[in-house]
């Protein structure tokens, strides 16, 4: 009987069976969307925020991050994850700025903020100007249409050449332009969804979790989410809908590295899971999953 180095008969097959891992998973090709960027490590960015505090850039988009104007209180998935990171790192003074989404990168580069703390995804254009933390959580895009899907949209390819709404500066906007859609951009998801509801645009591509919040808050609306449409691999892998991360100036390598270590610990110890559950999500949103249930 052949024995593996672990002393188990059958080698990898037995190990896979013990771990409850499907055998076909061993053949899965895994994708690394973002490699190491340690060129500037040794800078003082971590020491600076430990001493002077940190300014987080959020955008008022539920459920990612929200600002209650009556109490000036911040809440949301990204707000709570970033606060947990700050606590883990020992950052005592946490401040917020609330630029529009399209102004997040300019605000970071001008040093108005220290972190793009409204989650941001890797795409080729962004990698040229900022760096990214390790993964925090995951969600995907969804195509939104008038209820009943009168034009019979069946795939993202069907959006080519059509007028499609998206949030300005978003991964959805970049993808739609790349596939040849005529993109109408909006400053906020509220304006975007109102325009779709009122027929000013016929289609929108938006974050699935944003629509879920809208759907619960607006019973009887006339928008349909096409959950049966699979997200193309090129919108997920390097196309702007991979892992939800946080953004940093390229020179702030120590801060970014510390953030990434903190996120790894908080994902591992259940903190991120608890935050996701608080906003109606689950551990399914910790890793990439197929979007056509």
Predicted features and spans:
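Bacterial N-terminal signal peptides that target proteins for export
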Residues: 1-10
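Extended ligand-binding regions for polar small-molecule ligands
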Residues: 26-40, 79-88, 149, 163, ...
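Extracytoplasmic small-molecule ligand-binding "clamshell" domains
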Residues: 28-119, 128
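Bilobed "Venus flytrap"/periplasmic-binding protein-like clamshell domains
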Residues: 60-63, 72-88, 120-121, 139-194, ...
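Acidic, polar ligand-binding/catalytic clefts
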Residues: 83, 94-158, 233-235
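Hydrophobic residues within well-ordered alpha-helices
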Residues: 85, 108-109, 159, 196-197, ...
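A ligand-binding cleft/hinge motif common to bilobed small-molecule-binding domains
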Residues: 119-128, 178, 202-240
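Periplasmic-binding protein-like
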Residues: 138-145, 216-260, 283-293
């Amino acid at each position: 009987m052949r024995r593996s180095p672990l002393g188990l008969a059958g080698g990898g097959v037995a190990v896979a069976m013990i771990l409850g891992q499907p055998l076909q998973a061993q053949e899965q090709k895994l994708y690394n969307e973002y490699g190491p960027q340690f060129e500037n490590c040794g800078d003082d960015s971590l020491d600076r925020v430990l001493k002077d505090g940190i300014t987080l850039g959020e955008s008022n988009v539920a459920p990612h991050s929200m600002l209650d104007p009556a109490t000036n209180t911040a809440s949301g998935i990204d707000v709570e994850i970033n606060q947990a990171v700050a606590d883990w790192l020992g950052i005592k003074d946490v401040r917020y700025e609330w630029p529009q989404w399209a102004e997040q990168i300019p605000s970071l580069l001008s040093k108005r903020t220290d972190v793009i703390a409204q989650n941001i995804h890797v795409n080729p254009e962004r990698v040229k100007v900022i760096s990214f933390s390790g993964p925090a959580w995951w969600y995907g895009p969804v195509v939104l249409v008038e209820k009943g899907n009168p034009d019979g949209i069946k795939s993202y390819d069907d959006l080519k050449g059509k007028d499609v709404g998206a949030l300005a500066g978003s991964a959805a906007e970049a993808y739609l332009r790349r596939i040849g859609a005529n993109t109408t951009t909006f400053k906020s998801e509220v304006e975007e969804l109102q325009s779709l509801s009122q027929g000013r645009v016929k289609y929108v591509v938006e974050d699935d979790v944003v629509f879920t919040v809208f759907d619960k808050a607006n019973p009887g609306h006339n928008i349909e989410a096409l959950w049966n449409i699979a997200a193309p691999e090129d919108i997920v892998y390097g196309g702007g809908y991979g892992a939800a991360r946080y953004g940093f100036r390229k020179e702030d390598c120590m801060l970014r590295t510390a953030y990434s270590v903190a996120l790894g610990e908080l994902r591992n110890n259940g903190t991120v899971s608890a935050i996701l559950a608080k906003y109606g999500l689950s551990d399914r949103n910790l890793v990439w999953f197929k979007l056509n249930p």
